[in-house]
Design a protein with these regions (language model features):
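A short, structured loop/turn motif at beta-sheet edges
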Residues: 72-80, 112-119
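Low-complexity, intrinsically disordered terminal/linker segments enriched in charged
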Residues: 121-145
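A solvent-exposed, acidic/Ser-Thr-rich amphipathic alpha-helical stretch
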Residues: 24-77, 84-89
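Short, surface-exposed coil-to-beta transition loops
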Residues: 66, 104-108
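A cross-kingdom feature marking solvent-exposed beta-strand/loop segments within repeated
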Residues: 39, 91-103
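Short, structured motif recognition centered on aromatic/hydrophobic residues
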Residues: 10-11, 35, 108-110, 118, ...
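Short, low-complexity N-terminal intrinsically disordered segments enriched in polar/charged residues
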Residues: 1-31, 138-145
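Intrinsic, low-complexity N-terminal interaction/targeting segments
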Residues: 79-82, 94
């Protein structure tokens, strides 16, 4: 696909993310997609797993989730982006009970596009910083050990 169409595909997928529309993702991803999560999260194989093991729990924890790319780079097969996700912690996330605190998460994403659909996604997020914003400072705990 063209660079413009690849960017448009990612933008439409982000619209679905921000609308928390799980079913809309069927239009943007291959059924056998692979989500390569941040360290310790592992990989999820398949669109249904991505929707119900990654997105749905995250939406439950952060129901006002909003993600925006600040920088995007693309070619005929790839799109890469970095930006910030903003949300309010209103449900359990990684064992942390709801705090009501706002968070700002730095992220980078890389998508491989095949046959006009997103087929793989490599995700890097600053989860330690988000935990710190929620009152859990893992590095301070390390220093006390």
């Amino acid at each position: 696909m063209s660079i413009e169409k690849n960017l448009e595909l990612v933008h439409r997928m982000y619209d679905a993310l921000n609308a928390q529309d799980l079913d809309a993702h069927d239009k943007y991803w291959t059924q056998d997609m692979i989500w390569h999560g941040p360290p310790a999260f592992g990989d999820i194989h398949g669109l249904e797993g991505f929707k119900y093991e990654v997105l749905k729990p995250f939406y439950a924890a952060f129901p006002d989730y909003y993600v925006k790319n600040d920088i995007e780079v693309a070619d005929e097969n790839w799109v890469a982006a970095t930006g910030f996700l903003t949300a309010t912690h209103q449900g359990e996330w990684l064992g942390i009970p709801p705090t009501g605190k706002p968070v700002k998460m730095r992220f980078s994403d890389f998508w491989l596009i095949k046959d006009g659909l997103l087929s793989e996604n490599w995700v890097m997020t600053d989860d330690l910083e988000v935990m710190r914003q929620l009152g859990v400072d893992l590095l301070a705990r390390r220093d006390k050990a």
